[in-house]
Amino acid sequence: MERGVRVFGEPKVELHIHLDGAIRPETILHFGKKRGVPLPGSTVDELMKHVSYQTPLSLKLFLEKFNHYMPAIAGDREAVRRIAYELVETKAKEGVVYVEVRYSPHLLANCRVEPIPWGQAEGDLTPEEVVNLVNQGLQDGERNFRIKARSILCCMRHMPSWSPEVVELCKKYQNNSVVAIDLAGDELLMASSDHKAAYEEAERCGIHRTVHAGEAGPATMIKEAVYLLKAERIGHGYHVLEDPELYRELLRTRMHFEVCPWSSYLTGACLPDFRKHPVVQFKKDQANYSINTDDPLIFNSNIDKDYGIVKEYMDFTEEDFKRVNINAAQSSFLPEKEKQELLNTLYEAYGMVPATS
């Protein structure tokens, strides 16, 4: 399947996309050359043969793809700011009017981070400066492309020692582009006491919370996310259907699922038959969910690809797409006033309320 053609031409909201999984291949090549970092190819086509894929792999093999290109980006100030800026430009071209992009500040740093990621030598780019650079890139992109962009800082399941700093950065930049905390990585690793403490502090300080859960892992991981970590949204969450009682409860409370159809196919999170995808059940039950790209670089995709899949295989209509995006806006981590402005933008574009101008 190729990148999608536009199937829904109205404004869209995207809540689940990883900054380090959404870098332009041209940008990777530029910084690889500039910094003398070897890459598995010297052209976009060659690079993409190693970085992206189109038939299902395990989540573990998918995660190994990052090793091919992250050394060209991590630890470089210009690169970090630029990938954030370019993401906003890409989303604007896709018709997204609001995006929440997530990343681990530690995985883009090379100083005051233990261990230093991607085999880098120690440098002078700290996790906090990474947050500042991403904020700059997002804010410059907002100004130039006239969409709204906010960020979510990720704790990593395999690195609980980073989590205390992640929540402190969320607190410090809470009113400056950062809207939430996330927990990502291998779901086989249960949330450690450090992750739990970080989420407790986030809740205490009014920081929004989402958790990757029930993607490759079982429904018990969603229980952990909701009841232990007090998640307000679930990243993926497909395996919630294995626990009907939990599913009914989350339907009742309008828990939001950040669904990524093409990703769920390529990581083997779901059965390869899209007609049996959990989203079919979510749609039938009018659950609260959004449609997102996750890692469009590695999946060689864009938002139209995911919209195309649910239209072709799950019979999504224009009205379904409108409902999904209104759900996304309502479940966004924007402050209430900005959330209402976003909803009004969608209502007006969708012809659901008369224009007030």
Swiss-Prot record:
GO biological process assignments: adenosine catabolic process; hypoxanthine salvage; inosine biosynthetic process; negative regulation of adenosine receptor signaling pathway; nucleotide metabolic process; purine ribonucleoside monophosphate biosynthetic process; T cell activation
UniProt cofactor note: Binds 1 zinc ion per subunit.
Bilayer topology annotation: Peripheral membrane protein
Catalytic activity: adenosine + H2O + H(+) = inosine + NH4(+); 2'-deoxyadenosine + H2O + H(+) = 2'-deoxyinosine + NH4(+)
Secreted is among the record's keywords: no
EC identifiers of the protein: 3.5.4.4
Binding site for substrate: H18, D20, G185, D295
Active site (catalytic residues): E215
Keyword field: Cell junction, Cell membrane, Cytoplasm, Cytoplasmic vesicle, Hydrolase, Lysosome, Membrane, Metal-binding, Nucleotide metabolism, Zinc
Any one Pfam family match given in the protein's UniProt record, by short name: A_deaminase
Gene Ontology molecular function terms on file: 2'-deoxyadenosine deaminase activity; adenosine deaminase activity; zinc ion binding
Gene3D superfamilies: Metal-dependent hydrolases
Cofactor(s) needed: Zn(2+)
Keyword Lipid biosynthesis annotated: no
Location(s) in or outside the cell: Cell membrane; Cell junction; Cytoplasmic vesicle lumen; Cytoplasm
Site note Important for catalytic activity, residues: H236
Leading EC class: hydrolase
Binding-site residues, Zn(2+): H16, H18, H212, D294
GO cellular component: a single term: cytosol
Family statement: Belongs to the metallo-dependent hydrolases superfamily. Adenosine and AMP deaminases family.
Function: Catalyzes the hydrolytic deamination of adenosine and 2-deoxyadenosine. Plays an important role in purine metabolism and in adenosine homeostasis. Modulates signaling by extracellular adenosine, and so contributes indirectly to cellular signaling events. May act as a positive regulator of T-cell coactivation.
HAMAP family: A_deaminase
Protein name: Adenosine deaminase
Organism this protein belongs to: Gallus gallus
Protein's gene: ADA
